[in-house]
Amino acid sequence: MVDERVKNRVEPAAMSPLQVRDILADPQGQNQQEDPLFLAVHTSPQTVYPDFLEFPLPLVSDRMKSLLEKYMPGLEWRAVILTDFKQAKQDVYWLLRPPMEDCLSAQTEWYPNQTLKRLVLRQGALESPVFRIKGSIEPHIYIHLAVAESLLRRFFTGIRLQRVEMEA
């Protein structure tokens, strides 16, 4: 989740939900190197470039990518170039596209608009240490406890962790 404590974070230009869905689509089976994605950013002299940006796309810094690759060596990455045209500056981030896991418990509760009210995950259904939830319209990234502890030991910026309920 986004860390609201990071003030003046860099903000990529807005994207439509359709664009986001297409970019996040699973690239497996395409056997081709994807071209970098260029996103314009809005900055000020106080702008901060955190290690994790959640919106409009889940983006990670080089440093965070290196750590996540240790837990998921087969994960495919796509370079995203954040471009500030006013200051003629570019920064490289990486699009995080973890696999979708079918791990929702029957105990999960939903609001009428299909957003999560109470999230409960099935204990044995988690294969990947970093994943998204199949069947959820919310864009959050989920991680195993070992990954969370590793991230916290290295003082990454821009992330906020929240415990998720597991099925008993």
Walk through the language-model features, giving the residues of each:
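Phosphate/anion-contacting hairpin/loop surfaces
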Residues: M1-A168
